[in-house]
Amino acid sequence: MAYALLAAMVLNGCATSKEKAARKTEQAAKVKAVLAEKHYKIVVNSMADLSETDEKRSPQLLSTYRLEVRNDSLITFLPHYGYNHILGEAGVGTRGLILYEPISSYQEELTKKSKRHIEISVEKEDDTLIFMIEVSANGNSNISVRSLRRDRISYFGNIMLD
């Protein structure tokens, strides 16, 4: 009786492991597909201020911030802490990274760790912004933004699959 119970538990565990592996494979295929279509949205839930200050900030974000690629356009609604070098402003306010701009360049490659590395460049008024995005097979995403006018900043979130 004990052997039958143990065998049932082991077989159930194997089925669960197979189901998890199948779900991971399916999710990786979905991530790959949305990236290939160049039509995806990344919902951002935290950020890291990478400015040259001694004080590093990494707040959780309470609102729905996002980065979206729609074919040849980049749409962002992201907060920005740090310094605006052209305007001489510090802090966060109405000057977040709010964009709806055509993409100047879009490059994607697969890294050695099986992550997708995407580099998107957009030009806005007198600034050029470069978005470097790392997307893992499970949809976790890291976004690093470089700008001529603002301090560098990073965001962390997940790609939306539905």
What are these regions, as identified by a protein language model?
Residues 1-2:
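Bacterial N-terminal signal peptides that target proteins for export
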Residues 11-13:
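C-terminal motif of bacterial Sec signal peptides marking the signal peptidase cleavage site
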Residues 15-18:
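Bacterial signal peptide processing site
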Residues 33-49:
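A short, Trp-centered hydrophobic/proline-enriched beta-strand micro-motif
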Residues 39, 71-75, 140:
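Structural motif
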Residues 45-70, 77:
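Extracytoplasmic beta-rich ectodomain segments of secreted or membrane-anchored proteins
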Residues 63-111:
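Mid-length scaffold segments of soluble, non-membrane domains
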Residues 99-162:
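Helix-rich interaction surfaces within compact, conserved domain-sized segments
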